[in-house]
Amino acid sequence: MSGAGGAGGGVGSQHRKKLRSLLEPEDLLAVLVAALAHDVGHTGQNNAFHVSSSSELAIFYNDKSVLENHHCARLFQVLKDPACDLFASLGKAQRREVRDMIVTMILGTDMGVHFKNVDRLKATIEAGSFDLSNKEDKTFVLEIVLHAADISNPCRPEPVYRLWTDKVMEEFYNQGDAEKAASLPVSKFFDRDTPNVPRCQVGFITFVLMPFYTALSDILDIGPLMTNLKHNLAIMECAAEDKS
């Protein structure tokens, strides 16, 4: 997450400094805990697989943000143990506020709400209505920063990006194998027998990441991340052309 607050200038720097000055210690605690726990207990498949396979988790969470609800629940189950209670020093009202923030941030990592949140971010920026002293606006910024960090692999330096792309694709292929075994339709790009990593990455960067990070760059200094993102897009576009 520190990458989203990288050095730079302009409007982003002003927003970043203001946000930092408005973060209370419990806000920082909530962000750190949400970042650490946002994927706890991940099963290696996505929400669509859980819903289509009628998994126990999908049934338990009524097909709604299945994994994200699961991550939240697992986190707070652990925190109920007095030996693991990170919030022991907080009062009742503070504990509730921190819990609400963490739940909001982790649920915001669901790709099912990605485009809605990007639209909200763009609309708020265009209206000039961000009020970082407002708890709702501040929590929303933290929510989108956590989500940005969660899907930031293409914003990393090329060697790191390639390494983690291979790991992500192997997870996709494992899900594709499970879909075949369950006689379910194989998700696009999840079939290891017909791999096309460059096309997968070009689509993800172009339609998901670039609009999101471009909007985010209006309120946070993420110049180095944007540079990496554009570089990695270019190398994947070249690879996609070579493969076609």
Locations of the language-model features?
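Divalent metal-dependent phosphate-bond-processing catalytic cores, especially two-metal-ion Mg2+/Mn2+ enzymes
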Residues: G3-P25, V33-S244
